[in-house]
From Swiss-Prot:
Keywords: ATP-binding, DNA damage, DNA repair, DNA-binding, Helicase, Hydrolase, Isomerase, Nucleotide-binding, Nucleus, Transcription, Transcription regulation. Residues 431-589 form the Helicase C-terminal domain. SMART domains: DEXDc, HELICc. It catalyses: Couples ATP hydrolysis with the unwinding of duplex DNA by translocating in the 3'-5' direction; ATP + H2O = ADP + phosphate + H(+). It comes from Vairimorpha ceranae (strain BRL01). It comes from the Eukaryota. InterPro entries: ATP-dep_DNA_Helicase, ERCC3_RAD25_C, Helicase/UvrB_N, Helicase_ATP-bd, Helicase_C-like, P-loop_NTPase, XPB/Ssl2, XPB/Ssl2_N. This is General transcription and DNA repair factor IIH helicase/translocase subunit XPB. It is an enzyme of class 5 (isomerase). Its main location: nucleus. PANTHER family: GENERAL TRANSCRIPTION AND DNA REPAIR FACTOR IIH HELICASE SUBUNIT XPB (PTHR11274:SF0), RAD25/XP-B DNA REPAIR HELICASE (PTHR11274). Residues 215-377 form the Helicase ATP-binding domain. Gene3D superfamilies: P-loop containing nucleotide triphosphate hydrolases (3.40.50.300).
């Protein structure tokens, strides 16, 4: 995040070491405030739940295991706090009330510096015009006295209308008064409203209601981001938001499968007719029949800047000429700033809502979302939702698979790409995967096996006789396989590439096995765990789901595995290490049992071409024919520093096709 977005004093703030002074009755309180704005919460104290709810509003969660939580107060978290109505005095007094120690002077000064000007002026959209609301006349006078702002305002006795919104927003940041955007949708008589409500059978959970209360206040809608674990009902939160605003809504997803699921869920939970909820994908080019409705599309469809078919261009023109009440952004964490700026500039909208499970990236671009979309409105505690039965309880395992001598000998001398495939195709890992599938199918589980490597995905699935989905799999075939997995008692295991990482709803799945992954991506690890958190049987007594990550011993996989697990460990999950599975060797019919079979497998790996070594990201890139920069952005890999690749550019050799 560019520091120009921060108050000038906050940019220069230092945190000198200070002595922690305990209160006389400190044992009655639940949190410690360190001199560097780190807060440690003891969850076993009597008032810890109230303290935790407050900390979520003013600080970033760092780590939340069972008994001790860590939070960090940042300029961005304080921006979010004042955006939802907390004042400087509210923050200071409540923090002091829960604290065991006297608040360090540097922390108090930092809070004051960050919140003194934040939240004091609002940009309100009323009657299709932009107005400024100030906390008091002194602040309003300061704005009007600024020459740049004054030249872009239309001031009357009753209101201050903004003429050039972007210029005023930029100038307000420069003078330490960033604008908070609110949409007065109830008084918007210019945009058409349409009849859409939740069905009487649709039930909203308490934490979902809390999310929505943060977004809607005094009859207005705030732009911002809501963070909920996979499987906890992010989609329903978005659907409830659009039924509250009741204006035309544009929903952006990461994939065509996600588009279908958003459409199905919206029709399931609301009374909308199928004619007014439409899709814009490479397969469907639809528009609603009434004056307003819902369009669901993907980020890449909207950001694509090549030549479109006449039918697609017609829909794109309609999207750009429509004024949208709500822009709903699913899986908001995976799309970097450049794509968001493009998407946001393409469409006229009044309110933005971002939904995500993991507000984390391996680069430093996640903070861009604070100002491109809005502040974080709410973030849930995974373990709290698990304890209440809203998401499933999970047992996580890291399974170490020893490399055979021949495979490891080649591993030590091959290129980085071949090394990676050798560690994935390790015969011991094959056997471990086969054993775990057999064991869990016998228990009645539905199993998802993930592999980033397309070559390994096909090899495992074909060898074990299981269906698989990856980039080139057609949309119809994808939906057919997923339907069979959900309903057919004979189809209990499917293999997925990284196309299944996000937005695939499979509540039947109760076991996940990961045979390869994207290096050290914490986000991907959490997203994959999320595929089994929504298990239908989660409320059954003693029911648990299982997450296995198979890694080849003494390879780079072990190094990346610890990095990947960090986010989940911070959410309170623990990984049990399985160093060996002796039961594997009791199966006389196990795959690649003999030396000759293992040698054949090794030869096939060594003879693999560069094309076969590609991950599914690259395969998808060629399949849909978009610029590499767009696709890397939409998958969240842009800027990550975990890859070592050969110098090559196959993309330039491929022609792009029309969308």
């Amino acid at each position: 995040m560019n520091n120009v977005m921060l108050p000038k004093k906050a940019q220069k703030h230092q945190f000198p070491v200070e002595e922690i002074i305990l209160k006389d009755d400190h044992e009655n309180f639940s949190l410690w405030i360190n001199y560097d704005a780190l807060i440690i919460l003891e969850t076993f104290k009597q008032n810890s739940k109230q303290a935790s709810d407050f900390l979520i509003a003013i600080a970033e969660p760092v780590s939340r295991p069972k008994y001790i939580h860590e939070y960090q107060i940042t300029a961005y978290s304080l921006y979010a706090a004042v955006s939802v109505g907390l004042s400087t005095d509210d923050i200071l007094s409540t923090l002091s009330y829960f604290s065991k120690n006297i608040m360090p002077r540097s922390v108090k000064n930092f809070i004051v510096e960050c919140t003194l000007s934040y939240g004091k002026i609002k940009l309100v959209i009323q009657f299709n015009k932009y107005f400024i609301e100030a906390a008091n006349n002194d602040i309003l006078k300061k704005l009007i006295d600024d020459k740049i702002i004054r030249s872009n305002l239309f001031v009357t006795d009753n209101s201050v209308e903004v003429i050039n919104v972007e210029l005023v927003k930029k100038r307000c940041i420069e003078i330490d008064y960033p604008l908070i955007e609110e949409y007065d949708f109830k008084n918007d008589t210019v945009l058409e409203s349409f009849f859409i409500d939740l069905k009487p059978s649709t039930m909203i959970r308490s934490y979902q209601e809390t999310c929505l209360n943060k977004m809607f206040c005094n009859g207005r809608a705030r732009s911002g981001i809501i963070v909920l674990p996979c499987g906890s009902g992010k989609t329903l939160v978005g659907i409830t938001a659009l039924t509250t605003i009741k204006k035309s809504c544009l929903i952006l997803c990461t994939s065509a499968v996600s588009v279908e699921q958003w459409r199905q869920q919206t029709m399931l939970f609301t009374n909308i007719s199928g004619d007014n909820i439409c899709r814009f994908t490479s397969e469907y080019k639809e528009w609603y029949k009434d004056k307003c409705g819902i369009i669901i599309t993907t980020y890449t469809m909207l950001a694509y800047n090549g030549k479109r078919s006449p039918e697609a261009q017609k829909i794109m023109d309609l999207i750009q000429s429509t004024e949208w009440g709500l822009l709903l952004l699913d899986e908001v964490h995976v799309v970097p700033a450049m794509m968001f700026r493009k998407v946001i500039s393409l469409v006229t909208h009044h309110c933005k809502l971002g939904l995500t499970a993991t507000l984390v990236r391996e680069d430093d671009k996640i903070e861009d979302l604070n100002f491109l979309i809005g502040p974080k409105l709410y973030e849930a505690d995974w373990q709290d939702l698990s304890a209440k039965g809203h998401i499933a309880k999970v047992e996580c395992f890291e399974v170490w698979c020893g490399m055979t001598g021949e495979f490891y000998k080649e591993y030590l001398i091959q290129t980085s790409r071949k090394k990676r495939l050798l560690s994935i195709m390790n015969p011991t890992k094959f056997q471990a995967c086969e054993y775990l599938i057999s064991r869990h199918e016998a228990k009645g589980d539905k199993i998802i096996v993930f592999s980033d490597s397309v070559a390994a995905l096909k090899s495992y699935a074909l060898k074990l006789g299981k269906p698989f989905i990856y980039g080139p799999t057609g949309q119809t075939e994808r939906m057919r396989i997923l339907k069979q997995f959900q309903t057919n008692p004979l189809i209990n295991t499917i293999f997925l590439s990284k196309v299944g990482d996000t937005s695939i709803d499979l509540p039947e799945a109760t076991c996940l096995i990961q045979i390869s992954s994207h290096f050290g991506s914490r986000r991907q690890e959490a997203q994959r765990l999320g595929r089994i958190l929504r298990a239908k049987r989660r409320n059954d007594p003693d029911f648990k789901v299982f997450f296995y990550s198979l890694v080849s011993k003494d390879t780079d996989e072990m190094f990346y595995s610890s990095k990947r697990q960090q986010f989940l460990v911070d959410q309170g999950y623990s990984f049990n290490i399985i160093t060996e599975i002796p039961e594997i060797y009791k199966n006389e019919n196990r795959v690649y049992k003999s030396k000759s079979q293992q040698k054949e497998l090794l030869v096939s790996v060594l003879l693999s071409s560069d094309k076969e070594l590609e991950s599914d990201t690259e395969a998808d890139n060629e399949e849909i024919g978009v610029y590499s920069g767009i696709l890397k952005g939409s998958t969240g890999v842009d800027g990550m520093a975990y890859m070592e690749t050969n110098e090559r550019n196959d993309l330039g050799k491929n022609k792009r096709r029309r969308k």
